[in-house]
Amino acid sequence: MGLSDGEWQLVLHVWGKVEADLAGHGQDVLIRLFKAHPETLEKFDKFKHIKSEDEMKGSEDLKKHGBTVLTALGGILKKKGHHEAEIKPLAQSHATKHKIPIKYLEFISEAIIHVLZSKHPSBFGADVZGAMKRALELFRNDIAAKYKELGFQG
């Protein structure tokens, strides 16, 4: 279920807006994730003590991790579906070290969509949203396939 060239262009155009402030977008994505799905916070030893949104907004560690997450995702998106080399180590660490269920990747995908809608409404119409959702689904499906190869039932 790949994306067309036009869909990838839409995804990468809006991703250019994200790259202008990776740390800020990443922090917003993680805050959205943790607010919508508080159980996900337990997977982050560095952050699980943080309870309030104000604490999250003031956390440099959270901001740095948001930057790391979106930098990695941007590298994957730029491969336009040809991301085997990027997916393999990510799946390995998320399955064996962090034990992140696929469901949590769905949750963070929802958070990404929400943040893009709120920060870039004029650049995130239905066509762009649809393309981004498909790109994130492709990413999740490929991570899930690697999880299966690794014997992780996440």
From Swiss-Prot:
Lineage top rank: taxon: Eukaryota
Chain positions with Phosphothreonine modification: 68
Record keyword Acyltransferase present: no
Modified residues (Phosphoserine): 4
PROSITE patterns, A to Z: GLOBIN (PS01033)
EC number: 1.7.-.-, 1.11.1.-
Homology family: Belongs to the globin family.
PANTHER family given in the database record: MYOGLOBIN
Name this polypeptide is given: Myoglobin
Species of the source: Ondatra zibethicus (Muskrat)
Source organism phylogeny: Eukaryota, Metazoa, Chordata, Craniata, Vertebrata
Gene that produces this protein: MB
